[in-house]
Amino acid sequence: MRARTLLAAGPMLAAVLVTGCSTTDAGTPISGSTGASTAPGGSTPRSEVDLASTDPCTMLTETEAQQVGVPSPGVRDDVAGFLSCDWQLSARDDPEFDTGMLVSVSIDPERGIEELNLSGAVRITPTTVGSHQGQLVAESGGFGGPGTCQVDLVISPSSHVTVSALTGIDTERACDVATRAAASVEPKLP
């Protein structure tokens, strides 16, 4: 029963973890870099990538998804104006996760991380992943209780990408999964 609840909650979790409002939030905003850099494996400057037309399901390859513990391909699940993709592992597939596991990549081309509503978060820690500054948010409050963690990466002052994980009740494991997934996503970002 808990596994079905977790899997059904995936789209709602993605929306709650990345939904922002106009209130002042806990944490320190971190400004991003505006300089151009070269995309991995190509010569197109990453700053020229149109974030709004990016498919979030291309952010984790099959190998990368397997390395963080979720099957591929991801399932596109745009929620509340965010471009989002979910990768799920059911409890049947891995008995270590009695409630399953969910990893989401959500792209918000119109709001920066300072606009996220993180009131109720247990821990907000500034972080850097590759060349992107951001924040690690443990138990982001609201629907994101124990067993949830997200890494918000600054793309610009008005855009960000959130990589989130839900692992049942183990928040530290969720933060480990979200951090490893963010490290795979980051080189593909502008």
Task: Go through the PLM ranges and name each one.
Residues 1-11:
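Bacterial N-terminal signal peptides that target proteins for export
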Residues 28-99:
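Extracytoplasmic low-complexity, Pro/Thr/Ser/Ala/Gly-rich segments
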Residues 123-190:
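A short, solvent-exposed beta-edge/loop patch
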Residues 16-20:
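C-terminal motif of bacterial Sec signal peptides marking the signal peptidase cleavage site
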Residues 71-137:
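Short, solvent-exposed recognition patches
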Residues 2-3, 45-48, 109, 166:
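A short, structure-level motif marking secondary-structure boundaries and short turns
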Residues 22-25:
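Bacterial signal peptide processing site
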